Amino acid sequence: MTMTDPMTTVRQYIDGFNRGDSTAMAAAFADPGWILDGIAPHVWHGPTASQDWYRDMLVKAEHPGASDLALTLGEPRHVDVAGDSAYVVVPATMTFEVHGKQVTQSGAVFTVALRKLIDGWRIAAWAWAKGIAQPHACSELFTTKTTYSVRSRRKPTRLLAEYRYSEN
């Protein structure tokens, strides 16, 4: 097996996503599998993790009217194969439409751990680190409220930072 074999499985998973084929996505996944993503409930685990995540992602996308979701992978930043384990870090871009406007989320990172089973490489776990969406047509998907706490000698100070992308 070559270093690119785990990437073949990663691409098969993404191709299944782009076709809206949760069965193909599940076929690339190990049992059990883990997913860590930015949408609630944030962690999925078990034999149906990829299908459960896909269902929850579609529900989240439906609320603001997002459609035509597609992922594009860049060239891997890191592929490490050690026996029957592999670790892949690849930049990714997500595109979708909201009310007829194209939205691109660039700068995302897709990190994947794989296991080599009898029938080939399978995804054991993946995590998605969100990028930046531009232009933005739906604040519901990418509004983030982050609270930072800074402590001084005398009293704690709290800063509430709110990031909103608005229609251009």
Where are these regions (language model features)?
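Short, low-complexity N-terminal intrinsically disordered segments enriched in polar/charged residues
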Residues: 1-31, 48, 122, 142-168
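Short beta-strand segments enriched in hydrophobic/aromatic residues
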Residues: 29-30, 92-94, 127-130
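A short local loop/turn or secondary-structure capping micro-motif enriched for an aromatic residue
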Residues: 44, 96-98, 131-135
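Hydrophobic/aromatic beta-strand elements that line small-molecule binding cavities or substrate pockets
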Residues: 50, 73-79, 92-94, 108-115
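A solvent-exposed, acidic/Ser-Thr-rich amphipathic alpha-helical stretch
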Residues: 4, 22-84
